[in-house]
Amino acid sequence: MNDLKPFVAKVAAREALSREDARAAFEIIMSGAATPSQIGGFLMALRVRGETVDEIVGAVGAMRARMLPVEAPEDAIDIVGTGGDGAGTYNISTLASLIVAGAGVPVAKHGNRALSSKSGTADALSCLGVKLDIGPEAIARCIREAGVGFMFAQQHHSAMRHVGPTRVELGTRTIFNLLGPLSNPAGVKRQLVGVFAPQWVDPLAEVLRDLGSESIWVVHGEGLDEITTTGVTKVAELKDGKIRSFELTPESFGLARTTLDALKGGDGAHNAAALQAVLDGEENAYRDISLANAAASLMIAGRATDLAEGMAIGREALSSGAAKAALQRLITVSNAA
């Protein structure tokens, strides 16, 4: 079948799709066979009714089947947020990725330009001088030689061109905000995944377990798709096939609480300058929240045994200049492609 309308009708009637039906529906969308109106109607019907674990697993299957893969070490990690939280913060996962890479853990970062915020990872990295339009072999070289590589979602999920304009016109989060972090082209088994709403923490951990991930934290921090330093972060940890739920506070990391205003960013150039300032030694709320996310990532990767050790390793990566050097290597290697 090459017609999305029956699936639109089913979801509009508040029926859940099986994994097979969800995969079939997303195959139709990503093949270009659906119209923008059908795609918009389908995405919003899913959102209003609420996407199920099976629907997400099926959709990810369709995404992964069409993506352009990248080779990365077995122990590589991705630090990624769904976006769509509407908070307009600095590029926290981007800075955390550079800290983790500076600590010696390979990072295969998957991200995009901003859709529902002023600056996505790609916007900030582009302003810093990282070349984004490079092929899979060049990205693999970045991961090997720089310790960090950036996979620009549009290049690895070319079928997304069929939904991009509709997503921009809708201007709100859809299931695709959930699918991006679950469709890393390097096939990483270790991830820190931030989600835009607390109700998605546990379901996404289930999805990632069903998809074969090994060591995962899915987090939401008081309105942020990150571990937050403003209050409580809800966490679902996937390890050894089991899911454990718990909460963290800034005090869990030995950090003082901050306000959301202190974390507000701007456009790509503004956020790039703020990121560079932290790498150059500035201490502020942006540094603290990025260190917290890096510390958790170092635990997920098995590099740190607890958050205190993760914070110490992260601070050393900054103070020694190792995180800054990781960015410089990424700029150099990506531009040599």
Swiss-Prot record:
Cofactor binding annotation: Binds 2 magnesium ions per monomer.
Record-listed anthranilate 1 binding positions: 81, 112
SUPFAM superfamilies with a match to the protein in the record: Nucleoside phosphorylase/phosphoribosyltransferase catalytic domain, Nucleoside phosphorylase/phosphoribosyltransferase N-terminal domain
Binding positions for Mg(2+) 1 per the UniProt entry: 93, 226
Positions that bind anthranilate 2: 167
Keyword line: Amino-acid biosynthesis, Aromatic amino acid biosynthesis, Glycosyltransferase, Magnesium, Metal-binding, Transferase, Tryptophan biosynthesis
Top-level division of the source organism's lineage: Bacteria
Enzyme Commission number(s): 2.4.2.18
EC primary class: transferase
Pathway: Amino-acid biosynthesis; L-tryptophan biosynthesis; L-tryptophan from chorismate: step 2/5
Annotated 5-phospho-alpha-D-ribose 1-diphosphate binding sites: 81, 84-85, 89, 91-94, 109-117, 121
Reaction catalysed by this enzyme: N-(5-phospho-beta-D-ribosyl)anthranilate + diphosphate = 5-phospho-alpha-D-ribose 1-diphosphate + anthranilate
Reported cofactor(s): Mg(2+)
Pfam family, one: Glycos_trans_3N
Subunit relationships: Homodimer.
Name of this protein: Anthranilate phosphoribosyltransferase
Native source organism of the sequence: Sinorhizobium fredii (strain NBRC 101917 / NGR234)
Gene, per the UniProt record: trpD
